[in-house]
Amino acid sequence: MAATSAAAAAASSIMGTRVAPGIHPGSGRFTAVFGFGKKKAAPKKSAKKTVTTDRPLWYPGAISPDWLDGSLVGDYGFDPFGLGKPAEYLQFDIDSLDQNLAKNLAGDVIGTRTEAADAKSTPFQPYSEVFGIQRFRECELIHGRWAMLATLGALSVEWLTGVTWQDAGKVELVDGSSYLGQPLPFSISTLIWIEVLVIGYIEFQRNAELDSEKRLYPGGKFFDPLGLAADPEKTAQLQLAEIKHARLAMVAFLGFAVQAAATGKGPLNNWATHLSDPLHTTIIDTFSSS
């Protein structure tokens, strides 16, 4: 009975398999092989991606990193800081835990592991890597969409009301809540709570989606009521146009913020000032005089 239990424990996928002493002299180690659930099938070999020589890059003659293979929409091989480089993990051997030894040795580094793809949906999260390139693409697109709305809002409000975007909050606090000059029947505190609840609910629903493609492009009657993405070829063009406009909007709003900090004026006022004297009213003159 004892021999049968010992043999079963030695062959158990949970307990692990004892490594012969000849492999690691002077220490007793176990190689744990966990076998919960069904055994995963070997991944199918996919065709090797080929990168064409006429692929557009961010700079003529630039060398694209290996992890930017052109598969993402709007990928021009620009990653000077290597932020999208796949994470590399060290694999350690198990520490020696043999009570019969005078000294137990720590596990050594036995190799490295690199995730091939970071968009692996699980019941709890859509990505296997928090700082992976797929997660960065989602953040870039979401921030770009907010920047497009913010840029349009900053220009529209200043054009229609004359109030700059950086002073909009002060006007609301002094004169009360309003929209395009029309008073609203809500206080600032009520509007803040409405914004928190509405945006919080939307973000909660978006983060509940585990499909990385649907997280970026949900589509449907709410987000594509005109059916513009029905044609796959047209969809690719629209996605490329969106990411280009998103990047331009993020740079534009960064310029709005720098202008507001340097001059205290809005973007339209700064633009009119520059057009009145283009040779002497530039960003260089502004910073040199401040």
Swiss-Prot record:
Binding site for chlorophyll a 4: H245
Primary location class: plastid
Binding, chlorophyll a 3: L180, E242
An annotated GO cellular component: plastoglobule
Binding site for chlorophyll b 4: R206
Binding residues annotated for chlorophyll a 1, in chain numbering: F78, E140, R247
InterPro entries membership: Chloro_AB-bd_pln, Chloroa_b-bind
Post-translational modification: Photoregulated by reversible phosphorylation of its threonine residues.
An example Gene Ontology molecular-function term: chlorophyll binding
One Pfam family this sequence matches: Chloroa_b-bind
Record-listed chlorophyll b 1 binding positions: W58
Binding residues for chlorophyll a 5: Q259
Organism lineage string: Eukaryota, Viridiplantae, Streptophyta, Embryophyta, Tracheophyta
Record text about domains: The N-terminus of the protein extends into the stroma where it is involved with adhesion of granal membranes and post-translational modifications; both are believed to mediate the distribution of excitation energy between photosystems I and II.
Function: The light-harvesting complex (LHC) functions as a light receptor, it captures and delivers excitation energy to photosystems with which it is closely associated.
SUPFAM superfamilies: Chlorophyll a-b binding protein
Protein name in the entry: Chlorophyll a-b binding protein CP29.1, chloroplastic
Keywords from the UniProt entry: Chlorophyll, Chloroplast, Chromophore, Magnesium, Membrane, Metal-binding, Phosphoprotein, Photosynthesis, Photosystem I, Photosystem II, Plastid, Thylakoid, Transit peptide, Transmembrane, Transmembrane helix
Compartment list: Plastid, Chloroplast thylakoid membrane
Cofactor note: Binds at least 14 chlorophylls (8 Chl-a and 6 Chl-b) and carotenoids such as lutein and neoxanthin.
Topology with respect to the bilayer: Multi-pass membrane protein
Superkingdom of the organism of origin: Eukaryota
Binding site for chlorophyll b 3: E203
